């Protein structure tokens, strides 16, 4: 796995904001790792039951994603150009390009990269990913 951060960083308005964004980027990386490992328990700590994922194949709610997790193989992934911003103190939005190789239900993932956007919110003392959307990069 390779992770390359964008040289153009968003301009946080404080060190605290920058630190929070860095922490949330690490959580996003953990989501990818737990999905690759098919670790449902760790995944549901990061992605709650009311989360929505919008994939090229359609809209998937977290319970459905977990139920089909073993049908999905992420053999390799790469995250590039991560950018984040905080529109308010309890929300972080990340955008980046992802390349993922693998298959679901016997069909290979589309081979082109996607632009990913994930909205993280703070619930109590924890950050959770509540919305993820992938958009194909045309080419």
Where are these predicted regions, by residue range?
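A beta-strand edge to alpha-helix "cap/lid" segment located at domain peripheries
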Residues: 2-139
């Amino acid at each position: 796995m390779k992770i390359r951060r964008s040289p153009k960083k968003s301009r946080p308005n404080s060190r605290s904001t920058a630190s929070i964004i860095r922490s949330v980027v690490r959580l996003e990386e953990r989501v990818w790792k737990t999905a690759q490992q098919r670790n449902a328990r760790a995944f549901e700590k990061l992605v709650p039951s009311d989360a929505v994922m919008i994939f090229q194949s359609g809209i998937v709610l977290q319970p459905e994603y977990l139920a089909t997790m073993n049908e999905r193989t992420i053999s390799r992934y790469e995250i590039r150009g991560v950018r984040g911003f905080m529109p308010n103190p309890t929300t972080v939005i990340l955008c980046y390009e992802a390349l993922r190789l693998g298959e679901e239900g016997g069909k290979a993932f589309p081979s082109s990269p996607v632009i990913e956007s994930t909205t993280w919110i703070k619930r109590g003392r924890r950050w959770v990913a509540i919305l993820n959307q992938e958009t194909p990069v045309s080419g």
